[in-house]
Amino acid sequence: WTDKVNVDFSTGDTNIDNYLKWICFQPVLRRIYGCSFLPYHDYGKGGRGWRDLWQDCLALLIMEPSVVRQMIVDNYGGVRMDGTNATIIGSRQGEFIADRNNITRVWMDHAFWPFVTTKLYLDQTGDLDILLEKVTYFKDLQTKRGTAHDNNWDHAYGNKQRTAGGNIYFGTILEHILLQNLCAFYDVGEHNEMRLHGADWNDALDMAWEKGESVAFTCAYAGNLKDIADCLKHMEEKTGISKIEMAEEMKCLLAEGTELYESPDRKQKLLDEYTSLCEHNVKGGMILVSTEQIRKNLVEKAEWLMQHIREKEWISAGDDMGWFNGYYDNHGNAVEYSKKDEVRMMLTGQVFAVMSKTAGEEQVKEICRSADKFLFDQKAGGYRLNTDFKEEKFDLGRMFGFAYGEKENGAVFSHMTVMYANALYQRGFIREGHKVLQTLLEAAMNFENSKMYPGLPEYFDNEGRGLYAYLTGAASWYMLTMITEVFGVKGDLGDLVIAPSLLPEQFDEKGSAGLKLEFARKKFEIIMHNPCLLYTSPSPRDSTSS
C-alpha cells in the first residue's frame, strides 16, 4: 500500500501531510469498498456507477498512469449513439449490461465527465493518438435519450451498436466525445437550458423529468465545448490532422446559427431527427469534416450558452452579492432566488459557472461573498450544498425529504465542495480556494466530531460527523486539486508545468514546500522555496506565490 500511494506532500504541517496520504489512498479503497456490501457505502450492491469509472481514472492518472489508457478506451464503449450511456457496469473492464427497466433513468451530467478525464490524460501524457482510437458503442432496448424503446432490438443483437449491414460499428473516441456533448447541447427545456431528465450529479434531484432543467450542467457542458475546441486546435498543430471522420448521421448536430440556438423547439426537433436516424442501426457511412469547422462550431455554441446564462440566470442580491440560478423545477419555475425575506442558493450551479468561466471575475467575487454568507457553516464542515428551502419540494427531487443538513439536502457534500475549491483555484482565487479545502480537511481531522476513518466522507451532517467513508469521488478531486492547483504541478499536452498557488502558511519554517510524484514515468521531487515570504495575502488574480 505504501508503494501504491506514491505521492508525498510537505507543507510544514506533518499532521496535514500524513492525512493527505490517507486521502491519496482513499481512491484505492473507494474502488474496493465504495457502493459495496459494507454498511458505510450508502447504496448499491457492489457495482460501480458511470461517474465512478471516470473519477477513479483521475487518481490513477497520478498514481498508476500506465493502466489508464486502456481503461479510458474501454470506458467509452459504454456510450450510446444518442449520447447517453449504460448505467449498469459489469465486473470486467469495458463490460456494460443492458438495463431491463421499462424506461431507463438518464442522468444528464453523465456525458460531461468522460472528456474531463480524457483532457487530464491528454495533458499528463501528450498522447493525442488516443482520440483516434476506434471504439464500439453500447446498444440495448433504450433509445432517444431514455424516452423510447427500440422494439427491433433483442438480446441476440447483442450490446454493441451495429450498422444496417449487420456489422459492429466503430467510431473514434473523438467522435464519442463530440456526440456526447453535442447531443446535450440540443436537449433543452422551455428556458433553453439543458433538461434535467432523471437527475444530474445530484442524484436526489430526481422528480423533475418533464420540465426540470439544469443550468449548473449547462455551464459545465459549455466549458467542455470550449475545451474540446482547444483540443482540436492542438491536435491539428501537433499532428497535422486537419479533417475528422465521423458517422454521417452526426452531420445535423453541426447545425449552427443564432436562430437555431435561441429556439428550444428547433433544438428539440433537430435532436429528435438525429436520434431517429440512429434509433436501431446506423448506416455505417462516414463523412469528413475539417477540424477548423468543428472547432468554430463548438466555440460558437459554447459562447452562445455562456452569454445566455449570464443574461437569463444571474441573481443580484445586493451588497455586492449574487449568484446563478442553477435549476428549474417540474413546474418550470426557477429554483434559486433572492427575496426580501428568503434566499434560495445552491452550490452546484456556482461551481460550474466558475469552473467553465461562464462567471466573469466580478461575478466570481460576488459568488464567493454569497457562498460565505448563505452556505458556509464552520461547525458542519464548510460549504453546504444548499440553503434551507423549508419545504418538501417534490417537484424537484427526493432530497427535500431528508432533514436539512442530511445528505443532498444542505449537508456539506465533500465532492462538490472540493470541486468548488478547484474552480476557485483555476480562476486565481487562491485564498478563497484554500479556505474551502482547509475547512473540509479540519472537519475530517477532528475525529471527536467526525467519528470516521481517515479520509473524506461523502458528507458531513449538522454536527460535523462524517458519513459514508468510501462512496465519494471527493478524494480523487482533493488529491488532483492539491497537486495541479495548490502546488501547481500539472501537465500541458505532456509537458511539465509548475505554477504554484501556495500561501505563506503552507511553507515550513525554512520557507520550503515540497511534492513527490510520478510524471511521464519518472519520479520527481519538486521543492518550492520562498524564504522571504514576500507577501501575506495574494490578490484574487495571483496565480503563483513562490
What is the predicted function of each stretch?
Residues 4-22, 70, 75-84, 119-213, ...:
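Active-site acid/base region of carbohydrate-active enzymes
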